[in-house]
Swiss-Prot record:
It is linked to Mitochondrial complex I deficiency, nuclear type 18: A form of mitochondrial complex I deficiency, the most common biochemical signature of mitochondrial disorders, a group of highly heterogeneous conditions characterized by defective oxidative phosphorylation, which collectively affects 1 in 5-10000 live births. Clinical disorders have variable severity, ranging from lethal neonatal disease to adult-onset neurodegenerative disorders. It is found in: Nucleus; Mitochondrion inner membrane. Interacts with NDUFAF4, NDUFS2 and NDUFS3. The gene is NDUFAF3. Pfam families: DUF498. Keywords: Disease variant, Membrane, Mitochondrion, Mitochondrion inner membrane, Nucleus, Primary mitochondrial disease. Essential factor for the assembly of mitochondrial NADH:ubiquinone oxidoreductase complex (complex I). InterPro entries: MTH938-like_sf, NDUF3, NDUFAF3/AAMDC. Its main location: nucleus. GO terms for cellular component: mitochondrial inner membrane; mitochondrion; nucleus. It comes from Homo sapiens (Human). GO terms for biological process: mitochondrial respiratory chain complex I assembly. This is NADH dehydrogenase [ubiquinone] 1 alpha subcomplex assembly factor 3.
Length: 184
């Protein structure tokens, strides 16, 4: 400690021992305007897009007790809708929905904002640990009956939100007529 104190006092007493401050010619100063010669770190970033048009959003055209019609493609049984794809979802009822069955929603990039869950012909309560796992990962969950979940999913996609859906087809009595058939 005494040596450090002695060196400090010597350093203050003899300014010639100090190293002159180094001024870097490329370092920005107050009031400095950027020029093309400046370092890349201080220049604006430019983004060029490979695909100019936004990808077509997923829309549920119709549903029945056997499955769903999504963007004109028939999907049989329960399915998970992701921003640009549809996958079969291996659940039989709302009781089969676990943390593992939702894991595909939090593994994706860009991150999904909200998952709409259709539980059949009635709104059913999901297990609390499943909802808590989604909440911890920053994903909102909206649980509805399948007819309302389909409408909510379409609405959120139309708004441009990053949305996922986990849908179980409703049993026999309910169905949505395809929008194309309803117009005829």
């Amino acid at each position: 400690m005494a040596t450090a104190l002695a060196l400090r006092s010597l350093y203050r007493a003899r300014p010639s021992l100090r190293c002159p401050p180094v001024e870097l010619p490329w370092a920005p100063r107050r009031g400095h305007r950027l020029s093309p010669a400046d370092d890349e770190l201080y220049q604006r970033t430019r983004i060029s897009l490979l695909q100019r048009e936004a990808a077509q959003a997923m829309y549920i055209d119709s549903y029945n007790s056997r499955g769903f019609m999504i963007n004109g493609n028939r999907v049989l049984g329960p399915c998970a809708l992701l921003p640009h794809s549809v996958v079969q979802w291996n659940v039989g009822s709302h009781q089969d929905i676990t943390e593992d069955s939702f894991s595909l929603f939090w593994l994706l990039e860009p991150r999904i904002e909200i998952v709409v869950v259709g539980t059949g012909d009635r709104t059913e309560r999901l297990q609390s640990q499943v909802l808590q796992a989604m909440r911890q990962r920053g994903i909102a969950v909206e649980v509805q009956d399948t007819p309302n979940a389909c409408a909510t999913f379409n609405f959120l996609c139309h708004e441009g939100r990053v949305t996922g859906a986990a849908l179980i087809p409703p049993p026999g009595g309910t169905s949505l007529t395809s929008l194309g058939q309803a117009a005829q």
